[in-house]
Amino acid sequence: MDKKRFFELIMDVCDWDQSGDDDMVIAPLVRYLSNLSDEEIFAFDDIMAELLYDLDTKKNFKRACKYYDHSDDSFLYSRCTALVNGEEYYEKVKAGKNNKNWTMEFEAILSVPMLAWGRKHNKDCGDYPLLSAKSIETGSNVDEWK
């Protein structure tokens, strides 16, 4: 899996007719990924973490705070919105050319790899074995917060 495929899956497999119910939106993606290998599920997770990490900057946080008071969590969930709106949208957010992003959240995408893995192995998603190399938490991209 690569970034292109990552964004294709989000745009083509998620049920966007269910907008407003994020769990329903991601349900088809969870089912789809659960039919792939663990390596593919983990790759999806790693790509998601990398993309979120790349948006984790002091500049973006300041931009976001112009639109409403962001906490560490809400800033993460707003970064998730950039992912679920496709690659072109993501790149605009990354370049600082789409500030509307900071008024929305899409936390549900974070659970997709864990839910898919749990479904595949008939296990609790809390037993998910991967910890991505890049942290998604706000402030993790230390170089971009200086």
Language model: regions and residue ranges:
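Broad hydrophobic/π-residue packing in well-ordered secondary structure
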Residues: M1-F6, M48, Y77, A82, ...
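Alpha-helix initiation and N-capping motif
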Residues: K3-K4, D22-I26, D45, F75, ...
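Core of folded catalytic or high-affinity ligand/protein-binding domains
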Residues: R31-T103
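Basic, alpha-helical nucleic-acid-binding regions used in initiation and control of genome expression
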Residues: E87-K92, G96-K146
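N-terminal, charge-rich interaction modules
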Residues: M1-L33
